[in-house]
Amino acid sequence: MAASDPTNALLREAVRRLAPVLPLLTELGSRFVDAGHEIALVGGPVRDAFLGRVSPDLDLTTSAGPDQSEAILAAWADASWDVGRAFGTIGARKGDHVIEVTTYRADAYDRVSRKPVVAFGDNLLDDLARRDFAINAMAMRLPSLEFVDPYDGLADLALRTLRTPGAPEVSFGDDPLRMMRAARFVSQLGLTAAPPVVTAMTDMASSLAIVSAERVRDEFVKLMLGSAPRQGLALFVETGLAAHVLPELPALKLELDEHHRHKDVYEHSLIVLEQAIALEGPPDGPASSVPGPDLVLRLAALLHDIGKPATRRFEDDNGVSFHHHEMVGAKMTARRMRAMRFDKDTTKAVSRLVELHLRFHGYGDGEWTDSAVRRYVTDAGPLLPRLNRLTRSDCTTRNVRKARTLSRIYDDLELRIARLMAQEQLDAVRPELDGNEIAEVLGIAPGPVLGRAYKHLLAVRMDQGLIGREAAAEALRGWWAEQPESDTVT
C-alpha cells in the first residue's frame, strides 16, 4: 500500500535529520555485517528523526553478543566501555557522537517483582515486539538503511497517537512503569493515548505500586519538562495513576457547592502551570530569565495550592476561605517530594515557592514601600526570578479589570525592585554593622543578646535602607537603652 502524504513527509524529514550521522552509521553497520551480524538504529533516535527532532543518543540493536559488540567497537571507536554487559549493552564514542549497542532482547518478566529476566534474542522483529510503544518499535537496518516498522509506528506518528505493539494489558503487566511513560510521551511529543491504552492504564494503575519511587519520579520529571505537560498530567490524573504517585493533585478537584463560591482549584492549577511555562526564558538565557524548561518553577506552579483542600472553610457570609493554605501547602509539598525521592535542593526550593506564593498579595493594592520591597526580595532570595513568574502566573481571574490592576501593581513592584537593586545590594541585605562591631558599640559578649541586637539592626536596614554606620550605631544605642540587660553592662 502506498504511503500517505503525512507519512511521506515524515520519511523525508527523517532522512534530513539523520543526514549528518548517516556516514558514521553506515560505516559502523558495515563493520557488524562484515563480521556476520545484523545491526539497526532503533527506538528513540528513529522516532525523533521522523518528528524533526535531534536525538542526543544513538541507540542500536544487534544480533551480536556483548563480547562481539565490544570487540568491533573497540577496533572502530575512539573509546568504548561497558554500559551494562549483563543487559547486553556496550557504549562507544566516535568523534562527537556517543553510541550504545545492545544485543537483541527477548526478556521475560518476573511475575511478582515485574523485573526483567534478561534473555538475548536472535532477530530484530522479536526485539521490536517487546518495546513499550509502536512509535518506539521502529528501526533502520544498517548499512542498507532499510526501514522496519512492523507495528505501524510511523502511521501513529502521523496520526499523533500512542499505541502499544501488542495488547496494552500485556505490555503494562510486563512493566507497569510503561503507564508513566505513556503520560510522559503525551507531554513530550503531543500525542494522544489510544482508547485501549487509556483503558488498560485505568484498570492497572494500582500495579504502579511495585515500581521504585525513583523510577516513577524520573518519568514524572520528564512529563513535567515536556512541551505539553497539561495533557500528560490530564492522562496521569484521569487514569488514576496520580492517586498512587501524587494524590494531592487529584484531591484539588474539590466538589463545588451549589453557590460555586470558589474556582475549580485543579483547573486553576493547570492554568497557572501553563502561564508559568509561557513566562520561562529561552534555554540559553541568563538565570534571571528562568531559562526553560524549569522544573522548580513548573512544580511550584502545579503544587502552589495543594494546601487548599485541607484548609477550605465555608463562611457564614456565603464565602469560602483557605486561610494559611500556603503554609500548609509548603509542608505538604515537602512531604510528597521526599516520598517521591526528589533531591533536597529541589524539594526546598519548590516548597519555599509554595510558601511565598501569596506574599505579593499580603501587601495590599497600595503603593509598595521600600521596606516592603526589601523584605519581599530578601525573603525570596535566589528564588526571586521564579517567585516573580509564579506570582504573575497565579492570576486566572476572568475579571479583566482586576487582572489589569494586578498586572499594573506587579509591573510597579518589579520597577521598584530594579531601582532599589541599582542603589543597594538587595540580594544580600544585612545590617550596616557586623557582629563584632555591634558587640563593641554595646560592650557585650557574643550570645543571645547580641543576636537580638543584630536582628534589630536588620529590621532597621529593612525599614530605612542604607542610613550610614554612625546612624546605625545611634539606632542601636537607642534600642539598647530600652533593653533590661543594658542596666547590667558597665
Model features per residue range: what roles?
Residues 1-490:
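Catalytic cores of the polymerase beta-like nucleotidyltransferase superfamily
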